Amino acid sequence: MHIHSYQHRAGLNCETTCMRNVLAVHGVEFSEEVLLGLDGGFGFGYFERRDNGPDIVIGRQQIFSGQALRLLGVRARSFQGSGAAILLDQMKLERPVIARVDLSELPYWNSHGGAPFGGYFINLVGHADGQFTVSDSGFSQLQTISEDALNRARTSKRSPPINPERWCHVIESVCGTPDLGRVGYFAVENCVRDVLKPSIGNLGLPGLKQFAAGVRNWSRTKTGTVKMQLWTDGGVHDVSALACQLQSLGRAIEVFGTGGGLFRPMWSRFLHTFGDLVGDERLLDAAQAMSSSAHLWTMLGRNLLEVGPDSGQATLEQQLEALIDAIDRIYQLERKAMDGLRSIRPLATRVPLAAAHLNTTSNFA
């Protein structure tokens, strides 16, 4: 069994790639940047470990909120359940299944169980001989995974509080022609509100402030050694806890499906596209501030990826000092962007609604 209308394309972020590729099955094209912007989940999250293992840093505050799909007039359904049958029932209806999994449990990633992350998404687009065909944003070709391995990835409890919890999503139909000039403001306003005043202090700008404080303590909290999988040989080795933390942060920023720069380049491009479309300088100013933040995040992530098991203590301390300085500058830039978008509403005079319709790919793809 294979869903022949599905075309695999790699992408920047697992979640937006999955949505983009499944929407294309219904004949609709949206860019990943627009899907990220409309979904409203952009932001920041920081979860401190109680041991000396690496703290968790993420660039989103919601995982598959479904807001983008609702704003675009897409009828979708979410469900939970383990085992293959619940997935095959949907695929028999020619519906690709967007499955949430623990990245470290996907055998074709060859991570050997290292760096668990339960907020990863893949599309299931085929099944034969006990193997699912997987469309993964990180690969240029389709992958395969056994039913048992997929079930382990979907039921993993290894990355609290971000476990997959057996969630799956399908798109049933697409109706209507969305107006970015209307739904875009709604999405931005909701996102900014959640970043400025999140539901818990680990998220948004308060979370970024917590992160800055946590980083300042890493020289005391990230001591001793921890086990870490090295990309050089794929093996698990004992490494400095601080080195593990710094490289893990680099991976979170640049590698693990964020589009680079912890989603900041993607969101700044969304703001720029939206601002150009509706002629709103407030959006363009915020896009510029977020672009500057994106540059800092990207440089930071790339530098941290250079940290290795052989990095000396002096090198680690130098990287830590640079990180502290960068986070302080990032906070100021992102605060400026969010304050500029606080309670944003459509301009009294803007482009006609007809011109703002997302009815051609030139507007958003």
Name each region found by the language model.
Residues 243-365:
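Charged, long alpha-helical assembly modules
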Residues 31-42, 281-288:
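Short alpha-helical "patches" and their helix-cap loops
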Residues 25, 71, 90, 153, ...:
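Residues that form generic nucleotide/phosphate-binding pockets
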Residues 1-27, 38-176, 345:
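Conserved active-site-adjacent core of cysteine acyl-enzyme catalytic domains
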Residues 24-33, 271-278:
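Short helix-capping/linker segments at secondary-structure and domain boundaries
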Residues 129-256:
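Noncatalytic regulatory segments and standalone regulatory/sensor domains
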Residues 1-8, 16-24, 47-59, 121, ...:
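Short, charge-rich amphipathic segments
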Residues 18, 63-67, 86, 149, ...:
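Exposed alpha-helical structural elements
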